[in-house]
């Protein structure tokens, strides 16, 4: 990842967990202490292997396990981790190592961004969604009762280590949810990659390691290109929010009972409907192509049964892409190309949301 004078490596491959300590020492040679943050689901699977790899490299490592789930992305949990940093005697050469999915990465990243005004962060994503999206780009944060990621900071990791072997332990539902972000990358930037995903759906869901490695590597490439051009989301990087306007609103409206990727899938379909109704989409019925692909990946493409689209409206008004009271929508023009625009009529939005009604 190249960010002007800043740069950091993204490692993608099988068997990287055993090399974690050596990789940290290579890129953070001054680091002698670390706080390893993981959750209750990941700790029994990889917690000891990660800690041992760090210790073998001469890095004294304290391990902290937080409850699994979105509720851990809170200021109270961050406060608890600050106390763990103090007990572990971390200094500005020490590292926070985030071992887990997006929740752990966002939470631990926020702590690394703010403890001692910023210490090194190592992302070790263990879910597909985290490997292809949330571990890259430096966004960290916690939630408030009023919505997701309302408190946060930009803090780039010192390195990302994505061991695709960890995907073997993922429940099928989480693997599918991660594929929503993969599809997003194809729609916003690379139609050839989108076609590859369409062809490889069966192999993805079967957990084919070679296919998953390519899916992760290509997604990382696409996201890295976008983030490198716009690290702090002043322009181009906003395209990575395709599907997230409605997706984040849906997550909050239903109390986070669906996975993030499931809500993003619905959000992408909504954006495609709105783009067609607004005359922005240049290719006919992209929403049908998207719907077919997402459904083959076992992802939802409509709202939960019985949900009124109007229930999304209060949460849409809190979208982070609002400027001067107007949402800037990420709209698909054609596969591989999107545009960010505030020029979307209320009628088109209503029509697009109604199209999601089950």
Curated annotation (Swiss-Prot):
A Gene Ontology molecular function term of the record: nucleotide binding
Signal sequence range: none
InterPro entries the UniProt entry points to: Dehydroquinate_synthase (IPR050071), DHQ_synth_AroB (IPR016037), DHQ_synth_fam (IPR030963), DHQS/DOIS_N (IPR030960), DHQS_C (IPR056179)
GO biological process, one term: aromatic amino acid family biosynthetic process
Cofactor(s) recorded in Swiss-Prot or TrEMBL: Co(2+); Zn(2+); NAD(+)
Cofactor stoichiometry and binding remark: Binds 1 divalent metal cation per subunit. Can use either Co(2+) or Zn(2+).
Keywords, comma-separated and alphabetical: Amino-acid biosynthesis, Aromatic amino acid biosynthesis, Cobalt, Cytoplasm, Lyase, Metal-binding, NAD, Nucleotide-binding, Zinc
CDD domains according to UniProt: DHQS
Role this protein plays: Catalyzes the conversion of 3-deoxy-D-arabino-heptulosonate 7-phosphate (DAHP) to dehydroquinate (DHQ).
Similarity remark: Belongs to the sugar phosphate cyclases superfamily. Dehydroquinate synthase family.
Name of the protein in question: 3-dehydroquinate synthase
């Amino acid at each position: 990842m190249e960010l002007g004078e800043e740069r950091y490596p993204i490692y993608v491959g099988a068997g990287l967990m055993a090399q974690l300590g050596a990789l940290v020492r290579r890129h953070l040679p001054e680091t002698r202490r670390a706080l390893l943050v993981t959750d209750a689901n990941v700790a029994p699977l990889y917690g000891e292997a990660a800690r041992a790899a760090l210790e073998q490299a001469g890095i004294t490592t304290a391990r902290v396990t937080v409850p699994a789930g979105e509720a851990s992305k809170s200021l109270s949990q961050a406060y608890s981790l600050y106390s763990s940093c103090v007990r572990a005697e971390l200094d500005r050469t020490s590292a926070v190592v985030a071992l887990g999915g997006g929740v752990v990465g966002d939470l631990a990243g926020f702590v690394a961004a703010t403890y001692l005004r910023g210490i090194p962060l190592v992302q070790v994503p263990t879910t597909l969604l985290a490997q292809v999206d949330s571990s890259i780009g430096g966004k960290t944060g916690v939630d408030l009762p009023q919505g997701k990621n309302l408190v946060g900071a930009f803090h780039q990791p010192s390195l990302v280590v994505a061991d695709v072997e960890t995907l073997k332990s993922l429940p099928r539902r989480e693997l599918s949810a991660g594929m929503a972000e993969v599809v997003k990358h194809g729609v916003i930037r690379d139609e050839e990659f989108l076609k590859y995903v369409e062809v490889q759906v069966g192999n993805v869901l079967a957990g084919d390691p070679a296919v998953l490695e390519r899916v992760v590597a290509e997604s990382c490439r696409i996201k890295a290109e976008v983030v490198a051009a716009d690290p702090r989301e002043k322009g181009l990087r906003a395209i990575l929010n395709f599907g997230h306007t409605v997706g984040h609103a849906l997550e909050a409206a239903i109390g986070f009972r669906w996975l993030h990727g499931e809500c993003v899938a619905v959000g992408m379909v909504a954006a495609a409907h709105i783009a067609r109704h607004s005359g922005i989409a240049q290719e006919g019925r992209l929403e049908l192509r998207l719907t077919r692909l997402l459904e083959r990946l076992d992802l939802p493409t409509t709202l939960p049964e019985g949900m009124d689209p109007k229930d999304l409206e209060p949460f849409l008004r809190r979208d982070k892409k609002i400027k001067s009271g107007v949402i800037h929508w990420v709209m698909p023009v054609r596969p591989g190309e999107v545009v960010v625009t505030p020029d979307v009529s209320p009628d088109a939005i209503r029509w697009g949301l109604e199209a999601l009604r089950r």
